[in-house]
Amino acid sequence: RGYSNLDRFGCLDSDGDGWSDVDPGGLDGVEPWFAHPNGSADAFPFTPSQWNDTDEDGFGDNWADGSWNETRMNWSIGVWYANASQPDACPFVTGFSVEDRFGCPDADNDGWSDPDSNWTASNGADAFPDNPTQWSDRDNDGWGDNQSEGALQVDDFPDNPTQWLDTDGDGWGDNNSYGATQVDDFPLIPSQYRDTDGDGYGDDINGFEGDVCPLSTVEEVESGWIS
């Protein structure tokens, strides 16, 4: 007993979407009935909002985003369906991304799709498509936002595009190039980060070799009268 009425009539339709379940063994006594795209049966027998899967990656051709309507209708695959489950953003290309969009190529298998001409890192694609431990770079400096244990190419300053490494872990960055901010004058000494008078001794009196006179003038420092 069944109630399918779209691909064939009167066959089992577990999710009630009108598309019959697969019957590869010909148990109906007629002939094998394969799932789309190899046949017309429901590729998602337990998901009523999906039934076709053109690229066979496990993500359906139907979509829920109305902005896709014109393009998808021109492609003649799938239909708009309110709250469609896991709509394939790349219906002609096999892919397994699940984070920023469903069903697109994901070279490093971290869940975030590889960027392409229509979907870049600024849209949500993987900013590091070959590094499975990184995917986002909100300050666009080439170092990743993920700071979890084991992550590579970690940005110690994810919101400062002029800094990325903090070797001594004091919250001040190693990069001292022109224009950089939050610069550590002592990148290897965690108890010092600023040297206001440029004499090589840190301003923090309680830190390593703290400067007793942190505001000495250039002339005083250069003359050696005071440090």
Describe these PLM feature segments.
Residues 1-227:
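Extracellular calcium-associated, cysteine-rich motifs in secreted modular proteins
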